[in-house]
Structures are given as structure tokens and as C-alpha cells.
Amino acid sequence: MASRTIIGIDPGTNLLGFGVIRVEGRKAVFVDMGVLDLRKDKSPHAKLRQIYETVSEVCKTYHGDEMALESPFYGKNAQVILKLGRAQGAAMIAAAEQGIDKVFEYAPRRAKEVVTGNGAASKEQVSIILQNTLGVKFDDSHPLDATDALGVAMCHFYQ
């Protein structure tokens, strides 16, 4: 069975997380994860450009085959949903331009439920489960936005 690479994205306009796994047969292997920190930039247009450029680079570097995105969750105010939707759109366009035409969306509760068995799991709980599942140790250089993105990638792997 051929391997494939899944790129998980936790879109945000302040912090955008990404997580990359490689699927080998029936096993997921940790590749990388990180965060794009957008808090210093006040221009929404500049933030979207940075999201696009970063996601493009991640897709190109890791030769992504599929992308799993955390969808904006309901209950936040309309302005927040709109901003998150724009960030998600920038990531989707970046993926498409890098040849990734398989893009899947998962609600945060669904991703947590699939990964941990509990849709209300904390970010810390998700991180612990991912470390155990993937056999890696995360430290403070791996912000929780990155582990959220990795969780979305793992959610897609389990589907």
C-alpha cells in the first residue's frame, strides 16, 4: 500500500497551527508541526497573505496528498466566524495551488472525539493522546495550536 501525507490545519487569524503525518499502511507517522504567529501584524490582508504563503510552503515541503482543516465552530460571533472563514479559504487556495485537491473539514468537537473519545477534551488532553499514539514527545516549542492541527490530521486518518 502506498504512503500518503496528510496536512492538518488549525486556521486562525492570530495563530495558525499545522501538523503533518505520513500514513504508511495502517499506521500514522509523525512528520512535523508548527505555528504561524500572526499576532504582531495588524493588517488582515497581510495576515491572509502570510497564511497563504506558509500553507503553500508546508504543502510543497511535505508533498501533501490530503488536507484536513478544523472548521470554524458555531457560537462565536459573526465577525470571528468571518475571519476564520477567510483564513480557512487562504489555506484551501494554497493547498489547491500545490495540487492538493482532497480537502476535508472537521468540527473541533468531532476531531477531539475521534482522537480522544471525548468531544469536550481539553487541548492538553489532545496533546497527551497524540504523544502516546504517535510515540513522540512534545515540549513547550510545540504550541497547542500545532497539536490541534495534528489532531485534525489524525482525525482524518481515522476516518
Residue ranges and their predicted role:
Residues 1-159:
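Phosphate- and other anionic-substrate recognition elements at nucleic-acid/protein interfaces
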